[in-house]
């Protein structure tokens, strides 16, 4: 609760400035190298600091995608996890790409067209919108779960509560 009860975290770090920068963007791209079939430790620490943004769905309405690089294994699983975190944040993902570079010196160059296609898909989602019924159901379930947190803290977090009311998530 030290970083979420009143919206002010006891950790003196760059996360508030980073959150403001992310809020000002149209889209979010999460990327991580793969270490032992998982995201990097730094990415995990960053995600842990996003708990408040997750609970209050601060990035709802944005679009995103995921990118992972690996020597050999775990890339697809990391892409799936990064997209899962995007959904937790209220973000609709347009997909992801994993590049395994281990024994293929040309893997990065070979993946360029897929990466460009993903970027175009993300830009198109920002420009024209994008819906995915399966993700919309996940986002609705997440909001239903986090609604109790917003209601419980409405007197401490009036701005967040009012945003949820404005979005129609609390009636």
Residue ranges and their predicted role:
Residues 1-9, 107-108:
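N-terminal beta-loop-helix "entrance" segment that forms/cooperates
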Residues 7-92, 98:
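Helix-loop-strand module that forms the ligand-binding subsite of alpha/beta enzymes
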Residues 92-171:
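Glycine-rich phosphate/pyrophosphate-binding loop and the adjoining helix
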């Amino acid at each position: 609760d030290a970083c979420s009860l009143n919206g002010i975290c006891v950790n003196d770090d760059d996360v508030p400035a980073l959150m403001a920068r992310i809020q000002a963007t149209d889209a979010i791209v999460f990327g991580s190298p793969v270490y032992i079939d998982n995201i990097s430790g730094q990415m995990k620490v960053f995600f842990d600091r996003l708990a408040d943004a997750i609970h209050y769905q601060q990035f709802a309405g944005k679009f995103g995608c995921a990118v992972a690089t690996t020597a050999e294994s775990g890339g697809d699983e990391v892409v799936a996890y990064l997209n899962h975190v995007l959904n937790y944040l209220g973000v609709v993902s347009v997909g992801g790409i994993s590049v395994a570079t281990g024994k293929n010196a040309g893997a990065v160059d070979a993946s360029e067209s897929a990466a460009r296609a993903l970027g175009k898909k993300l830009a198109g989602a920002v420009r024209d919108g994008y819906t995915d019924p399966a993700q919309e159901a996940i986002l609705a379930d997440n909001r239903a779960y986090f609604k109790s947190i917003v209601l419980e803290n409405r007197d401490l977090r009036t701005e967040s509560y009012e945003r949820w009311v404005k979005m129609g998530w609390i009636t």
